[in-house]
């Protein structure tokens, strides 16, 4: 009903061949095939490299006390850095 029938596809194919010619369509087809082949090769080349270098993230559960200890250590480091900067001036 609303779809394209085989006859409509054949008519479109004949019109395309008449417009472009068989030589032009052949070269376009071979260029398209070569580009698809190159794309697939590039995709398969990237996958092994990605698998070798990728590592899962190391997530550790932290409690509130651990987080507070981390922030205290960071604050102490920044205070030491500030004192060191003041001493240099």
Swiss-Prot record:
| Gene null: resulting phenotype | Disruption of tatA affects the correct localization of multiple enzymes whose precursors bear twin arginine transfer peptides. Export is completely blocked when both tatA and tatE are inactivated.
Domain of life, per the record? Bacteria
Q: Where is the composition biased (Basic and acidic residues)?
A: 76-89
Membrane-crossing residue ranges in chain numbering: 1-21
**What are its GO biological-process terms?**
intracellular protein transmembrane transport; protein transport by the Tat complex
Q: Which InterPro entries match?
A: TatA/B/E (IPR003369), TatA/E (IPR006312)
One Pfam family name from the record?
TatA_B_E
Gene Ontology CC annotation, any one: TAT protein transport complex
Region Disordered, annotated ranges: 65-89
What other comment is given for this protein? TatA forms a transmembrane channel with a lid structure on the cytoplasmic side. The number of TatA protomers can vary so that the channel can adopt different diameters to accommodate substrates of various sizes. This enables TatA to pack tightly around substrate and prevents ion leakage during transport.
**Listed name of the protein:** Sec-independent protein translocase protein TatA
The record lists the organism as Escherichia coli (strain K12)
């Amino acid at each position: 009903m609303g779809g394209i029938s085989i006859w409509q596809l054949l008519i479109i194919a004949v019109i395309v061949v008449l417009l472009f010619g068989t030589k032009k369509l052949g070269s376009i087809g071979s260029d398209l095939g070569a580009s698809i082949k190159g794309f697939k090769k590039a995709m398969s080349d990237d996958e092994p490299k990605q698998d070798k270098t990728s590592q899962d993230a190391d997530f550790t559960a932290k409690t509130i006390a651990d987080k507070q200890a981390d922030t205290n250590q960071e604050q102490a480091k920044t205070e030491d850095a500030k004192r060191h900067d003041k001493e240099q001036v």
